[in-house]
Amino acid sequence: MRVGCDIIAISRIEKIHSRHGKNFLDKFLSPKEQILIKNPATLAGLWAAKEAASKALGVGICELCSFFDIEISKDEKNAPKLKYSQKITKDFNITQTSLSISHDNGFAIAIVAVV
């Protein structure tokens, strides 16, 4: 099992989004993922989730794992769900994933575990 974690100030993501708008969103979120955004906290949570997912692989966001190799969605209970691209799943021999996102006191944090 491998674990990745990321924490980000919600205000930091909010400022970047205010400055760059949809161009910022398009750099790391698919159109389906953009629908999940309800407020700056959820946007920061999505950023943290993708960063944590890349760190769980031990590589971070780079040429081996782009933001678009990681898909965030919701399950039937509205809990966050993580799916890697087929390439990542195969290259890193991933059989299971788990994602948790939380927001509090101006920060968003995400933790990812992969097996």
Curated annotation (Swiss-Prot):
Lineage of producing organism: Bacteria, Pseudomonadati, Campylobacterota, Epsilonproteobacteria, Campylobacterales
Key words of the record: Cytoplasm, Fatty acid biosynthesis, Fatty acid metabolism, Lipid biosynthesis, Lipid metabolism, Magnesium, Metal-binding, Transferase
Classification via HAMAP family: AcpS
InterPro entries, alphabetized: 4-PPantetheinyl_Trfase_dom, 4-PPantetheinyl_Trfase_dom_sf, ACPS, Ppantetheine-prot_Trfase_dom
Species this chain originates from: Campylobacter jejuni (strain RM1221)
Reaction(s) catalysed (UniProt annotation): apo-[ACP] + CoA = holo-[ACP] + adenosine 3',5'-bisphosphate + H(+)
UniProt record, GO biological process: fatty acid biosynthetic process
Cellular component terms (Gene Ontology): cytoplasm
Protein residues bound to Mg(2+): D6, E51
Disulfide pattern: none
Homology family: Belongs to the P-Pant transferase superfamily. AcpS family.
EC number: 2.7.8.7
Record field: transmembrane: none
Main subcellular location of this protein, as a coarse class: cytoplasm
Name listed for the protein in its UniProt record: Holo-[acyl-carrier-protein] synthase
Protein role: Transfers the 4'-phosphopantetheine moiety from coenzyme A to a Ser of acyl-carrier-protein.
